[in-house]
């Protein structure tokens, strides 16, 4: 049996991607692959649990770009070099920046203008040390005057915006699409590094000309010292699933508007390190929270 440690609670897109990987790897590799949710501290608890697991091939980490913000915030004191990297196995098409319809703001530029006309008034929710923390800091750099509020995980941030406790949230598109359709929330732009083919109604903030982008990748990595053949074998199996399995492609599109995304070992690790470079300038802000 291979245990995939997912460092986030059940119910979000990290957990969903872990479960898809486990389900299809079980079929593809002919062995039992199961998900173990070990959440806490924005992903740090599970990352440490995976790092400290035996390197006998029985355990791997399936995490997201939050690993990078964990490292920069000091929530973990180790990086990707403490793992045998297997592959990037998925990509979230970007979070979406949302405001409550009552704010009367319909574009990101209008949000900047409103915030400048009302300094200190707006509150923006984020999850400390997670990817939304990085994006929130980029939004402030882009000219939005807002106070940051650590409002916890995805569903907590939605509740805070619905209840009027905060004015701006950054959430995965799948988690807020019902509120966008009902008109309760207004979406101002996606935070991936390009437009998302499965979300045609919203453009990325980057394509709109704003320097706000932090792609969320999901990756699989094994504890250091694991026989390097195993991460390669898992990577090859994921490649086959991602490139050829129609059922998988339909599932990720229906749930989170994802398109099949795969990067092998070195290329995958490079992608994560590139996005780390984008936000390394925020290290002191992450640590001062």
How should these model regions be labeled?
Residues 162, 267-274:
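Membrane-helix entry/capping segments
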Residues 176-249, 274-277:
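C-terminal lobe and pocket-closing loops
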Residues 1-82, 121, 130-132, 141-170, ...:
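N-terminal (or domain-start) structured segment
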Residues 65-76, 134-142, 168-201:
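A ligand-binding cleft/hinge motif common to bilobed small-molecule-binding domains
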Residues 9-11, 65-66, 100-105, 126-131, ...:
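Short coil/turn segments
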Residues 2, 25, 49-58, 72-156, ...:
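Hinge/capping helix and adjacent helix->loop/strand transition within the periplasmic-binding protein
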Residues 205, 261-264:
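A short gly/proline-enriched turn/hairpin at secondary-structure junctions
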């Amino acid at each position: 049996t291979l245990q995939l440690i997912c460092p986030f609670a059940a119910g979000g897109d990290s957990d969903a991607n872990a479960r898809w990987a486990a389900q299809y790897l079980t079929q593809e590799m002919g062995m039992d692959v199961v998900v173990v949710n070990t959440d806490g501290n924005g992903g740090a608890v599970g990352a440490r649990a995976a790092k400290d697991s035996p390197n006998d091939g029985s355990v791997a980490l399936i995490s997201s770009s939050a690993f990078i913000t964990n490292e920069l915030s000091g929530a973990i004191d180790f990086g990707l070099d403490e793992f045998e990297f297997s592959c990037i196995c998925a990509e979230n098409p970007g979070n979406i920046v949302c405001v409550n319809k009552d704010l009367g703001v319909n574009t990101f530029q209008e949000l900047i203008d409103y915030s400048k006309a009302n300094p200190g008034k707006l509150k923006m929710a984020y999850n400390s040390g997670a990817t939304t923390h990085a994006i929130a800091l980029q939004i402030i750099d882009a000219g939005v005057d807002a106070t940051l509020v650590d409002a916890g995980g995805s569903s907590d941030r939605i509740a805070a915006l619905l209840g009027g406790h905060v004015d701006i949230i950054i959430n995965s598109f799948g988690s807020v699409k019902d509120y966008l359709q009902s008109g309760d929330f207004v979406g101002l732009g996606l935070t991936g590094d390009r437009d998302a083919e499965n979300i045609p109604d919203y453009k990325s903030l980057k394509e709109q000309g704003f320097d706000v982008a932090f792609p969320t990748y999901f990756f699989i990595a094994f504890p250091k010292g694991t026989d390097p053949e195993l991460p390669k074998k898992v990577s090859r199996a994921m490649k086959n699933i991602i490139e050829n399995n129609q059922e998988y492609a339909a599932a990720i599109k229906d749930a989170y508007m994802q398109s099949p995304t795969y990067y092998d070992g070195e290329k995958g690790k490079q992608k994560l390190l590139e996005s780390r470079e984008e936000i390394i300038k925020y290290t002191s802000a992450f640590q001062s929270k």
